[in-house]
Amino acid sequence: MKMKQVHKTLWRWASIAWFACLSARAQDVQFLPEADANLKLNSTVRVYLQAKDDRDGGDPTQLTIGPSIQFYLKPLLKLKDITTFDLDDSKSRALVLETGYRSVTAPGAPPENRMETIATFHFPLKARFLISDRNRADLDWKNGGFNWRYRNKLTVERSLSIHSYHFIPYIAAEPYYESQYKKWSTTALYAGCLFPVGKHVQFNIYYEHENNTGKRPNQQQNYIGLALYLYFSLAKK
């Protein structure tokens, strides 16, 4: 299969997923769009800008936008080998530290300011599987009040191929502890796939199920997500 044909096929899949997600909005399944633009400054530092429809932890429809900066360790040979076809080269690092700011806005609600601090560990396994352990703390200021939450996302993924094209299916689980409820109030489960297109574009198409117990009655939420990741670099190869 020629690479040009693969690219056309992927764009077609992305279009189908987009329209499927739009039709799902009228049903119980909701659509979560996202776009991230990443710029690698050197071998150990990357910045990115993120814009997404954020309904994490049972939040209402809201727009989250803001920048982040990431700091890497040097890549490990084993990790670099099993993530060769993933455009996100942070996965080849055993530890990635990150901090960022997000402006959170929602219709009819006061704006929210969020600071994010994240530490992600990557572990290579046998049979070319990769485990990612992301530990994230959100510090939220809204209308004079303050809340925080801790999120621990564990992801298992493995690159597969059809002819010469490689894609990356994954599953993940993420529990949340939220200070406003003083308990582990949310559990999110994910199943998705990463589709690289060329050297700079990667799509993430996924299904997410959330169980929220912070408010009564408990809420079950289902989402289909479509994320566009752009990767650029100023670092010399």
Residue ranges of model-derived segments:
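Bacterial Sec-dependent N-terminal signal peptides
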Residues: 1-31
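Outer-membrane beta-barrel initiation region
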Residues: 26-42, 235-237
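Acidic-and-aromatic substrate-binding clefts and catalytic sites of carbohydrate-active enzymes
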Residues: 27-28, 54-61, 106-110, 182-183
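Residues that define the transmembrane beta-barrel architecture of outer-membrane proteins
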Residues: 29-31, 61-65, 111-115, 146-152, ...
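Transmembrane beta-strand segments that form the barrel wall of outer-membrane beta-barrel proteins
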Residues: 33, 44-56, 80-86, 93-107, ...
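Hydrophobic/aromatic-rich structural module bridging two neighboring secondary-structure elements via a short loop
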Residues: 62-123
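Outer-membrane beta-barrel transmembrane domain signature
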Residues: 73-77, 123-215, 224, 229-237
